[in-house]
Amino acid sequence: MMATEKLYVQMLGDFSIRRGDREVVKKGNRSKKIWHLIGILLTNRGQRLAQEKLIQLLWREGDECIDPANSLKNLVYRARMLLDDLVLEDEVCEEGMEFIRFSEGAYMWNEDIPCEIDMEVMTLLAKRGSDEDQAIESRIACYSQAVELYNGEFLPNLGEDEWIFAKRAQYE
């Protein structure tokens, strides 16, 4: 079983995931689909995503994909390999299986692993800042912290997909 050291995920600006002294960062276009999958799973944390839904989100109409189900399995395998870099020295983890789970035809991000995502923290701070029942100093501090977390638009290097545009609009 994996230890419970928290993951820190940055999705505003450069996409990266850090855990302890280990970090994986999206670089270049070669691994774009892998990061796209990870982004979908993290953004929908707590939800089971059917294979069909993931295929629909990952391969747009016109994208050439002969065997989407097999392509998805391969992509999940590659994502798990990438995430293995976050496993700490003293942990036993079977090929990233702890990060991405699969059951009954659906994939999901493992909710048992503590995870802090910049966009979620920023949203929470902005909400606290807008709470008129709080002291003005507290509200200003919350807004200041929220602004500090904004490092750029949501997943800027992952393309032009509709779900990404919808999220970007929330944070602008």
Per-segment meaning from a language model:
Residues 63-67, 92, 99-172:
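Intrinsically disordered, charged and Pro/Gly-enriched terminal/linker segments
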Residues 30-39, 65-89:
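DNA-recognition element of transcription regulators
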Residues 18-21, 80-91, 99, 124:
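Short regulatory "switch" loops immediately downstream of catalytic or recognition motifs
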Residues 17, 44-72, 157, 161:
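Positively charged, aromatic-enriched patches within helix-turn-helix-type DNA-binding elements
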Residues 25-58, 79:
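Short amphipathic alpha-helical recognition elements used for nucleic-acid or partner binding
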Residues 1-37, 97-106, 113, 152:
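Short boundary/linker motifs that mark transitions into or out of structured domains
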Residues 44-47, 61, 82-86, 132, ...:
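Phosphate/oxyanion-binding loops and surfaces in catalytic or ligand/nucleic-acid-binding neighborhoods
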